[in-house]
């Protein structure tokens, strides 16, 4: 049969804080995407416009005692995707998000526990995205994600994402 595609849902009536919603989402992610659990990803901030996820160095280390490039790529990709998932849950209900293009730049090695911050498009652009999803059922959204170390961007991601509403079951 077809592979199971997780549909992440949010109970909008729980009164949870945004950070608590992000943490609950990460628990779902750990269950449905084993790599996220292995990497020990954790939500540390979500304000409705930017999301920060962190990861410890130890399970993500390479042979040079720095963060493995694949782990860094995974973290920036998941952080951007999760930011759009959380935003769409809050504003649109159940949606799918898929990355359709990305560019990652590795500027400096990361030598300790690390975090990535995704910032959604500016309010006017993300509002236009919501309008398009409501009217056409889908839209594209671009965002930036960065991992900083020692006050400088060590890794950056620019990604295009498709966002579409989940058909009612």
What are these regions (language model features)?
Residues 21-28, 36, 125-128:
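Short Pro/Gly-enriched beta-strand edge/turn motifs at strand-loop
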Residues 84-122:
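Hydrophobic beta-strand-centered segment that forms part of the acyl-chain substrate-binding groove
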Residues 2-7:
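Extreme N-terminal basic, low-complexity initiation segments
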């Amino acid at each position: 049969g077809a592979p199971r595609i997780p549909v992440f849902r949010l109970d909008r009536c729980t009164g949870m804080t945004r950070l608590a919603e992000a943490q609950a989402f990460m628990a779902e992610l750990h269950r449905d995407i084993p790599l996220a659990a292995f990497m020990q990803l954790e939500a540390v901030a979500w304000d409705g416009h930017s999301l920060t996820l962190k990861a410890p160095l130890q399970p993500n280390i390479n042979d040079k005692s720095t963060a493995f490039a694949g782990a860094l790529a995974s973290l920036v990709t998941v952080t951007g995707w999760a930011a759009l998932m959380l935003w769409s849950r809050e504003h649109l209900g159940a949606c799918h998000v898929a990355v359709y293009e990305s560019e990652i730049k590795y500027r400096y090695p990361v030598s300790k526990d690390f975090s990535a911050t995704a910032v959604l498009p500016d309010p006017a652009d993300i509002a236009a995205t919501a309008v398009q999803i409501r009217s056409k059922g889908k839209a594209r959204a671009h965002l930036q994600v960065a991992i900083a170390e020692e006050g400088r961007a060590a890794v950056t991601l620019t990604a295009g994402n498709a966002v579409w509403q989940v058909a009612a079951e």
